[in-house]
């Protein structure tokens, strides 16, 4: 059987936080850079803040990733249903984060950057980058395991 000409379904990773204004937006930006072929990133929040945190935009631009055109989005059931992997960026309140009710959610527990110093937001950015790189590497490994 030839796989030539067949298109595999694009796999989706959903990054979730409350406001979808910084952590999940940075993760989406990094995933777009590091994702293996065939993967798509989406970020969303339970109570979107509106504009993306300008400090998050700034610290991402410092390393050559532009998230200024990304939009804060409310999480929808179809996003959850259609996601292959879901990352909870760090919300711990079950009332504000439905990701806590879903099985197979990866918990990252990343500190909220809102109101933090520029240096602290850079540290948070770097933490997110390392986690996204590891996630991308893990996805490559798992996609290389073929079951017959």
Give each language-model segment a name.
Residues 54, 81, 119-122:
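Generic alpha-helical secondary structure signal
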Residues 43, 88, 106-109:
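Structural signal for conserved beta-strand scaffold positions within catalytic alpha/beta enzyme cores
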Residues 2-77:
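Conserved active-site segments centered on acidic
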Residues 72, 78-101:
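Mid-chain, well-packed structural core segment of small domains
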Residues 38, 42, 67, 82, ...:
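Secondary-structure transition/capping residues
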Residues 20, 60, 86-87, 128:
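Conserved small-residue
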Residues 94-148:
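Phosphate-binding/catalytic loops
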């Amino acid at each position: 059987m030839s796989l030539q000409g067949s298109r595999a379904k694009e796999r989706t990773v959903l990054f979730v936080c409350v406001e979808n204004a910084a952590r999940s937006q940075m993760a989406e930006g990094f995933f777009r850079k590091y994702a293996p072929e065939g993967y798509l990133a989406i970020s969303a929040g339970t109570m979107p803040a509106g504009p993306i945190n300008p400090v998050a935009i700034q610290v991402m631009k410092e390393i050559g990733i532009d998230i200024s055109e990304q939009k804060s989005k409310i999480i929808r059931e179809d996003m959850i249903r259609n996601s292959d992997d879901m990352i909870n960026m760090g919300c711990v309140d079950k009332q504000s984060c439905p990701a806590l009710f879903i099985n197979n959610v990866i918990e990252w527990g990343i500190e909220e950057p809102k109101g933090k110093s520029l240096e602290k937001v850079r540290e948070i950015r770097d933490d997110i980058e390392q986690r996204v790189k590891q996630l991308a590497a893990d996805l490559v490994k798992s996609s290389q395991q073929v079951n017959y």
